[in-house]
Amino acid sequence: MLRVVAKAQYPAAVRCFSTSHAAFAKVSFESSEDFLKKIGRDTVKLAEKFETWDELKNSTSSDLKEKGIEARDRRYIMTQLYRYKNGEKIREIPRGKKTWGGERKRNLVQALFKAGQN
């Protein structure tokens, strides 16, 4: 025998799509130079490529590429802008340091190191 179970009396979930702009962090920056100083990694040297803070804040990765900014710096700036737009604390994230010659060379470097100890 099959039993029919009544459907729930609750309406389907309602999805709200926001059309407002992203809520930026409470920290505000006067110029692009201030932001680039805050994020560190010597990105302040790129401040001359941006006339205003709004130009940097609303930039896309392709905009930064057109300005001649290298991929590593572009990726770092875009990550920090993403954090800023999501209200996260802005701080310098130091570059990682390779151990044992990096992932690809690790086995070779460790083998040479161990061979040199004997």
From Swiss-Prot:
Biological role: Involved in telomere length regulation.
Protein name per its UniProtKB record: Small ribosomal subunit protein mS41
Keyword set includes Mitochondrion: yes
Family: Belongs to the mitochondrion-specific ribosomal protein mS41 family.
InterPro entries: Ribosomal_mS41, SAM_Ribosomal_mS41
UniProt-annotated location(s): Mitochondrion
Any one cellular-component term (Gene Ontology): mitochondrion
Keywords (A to Z) from UniProt: Mitochondrion, Ribonucleoprotein, Ribosomal protein, Transit peptide
Transit sequence range: 1-24
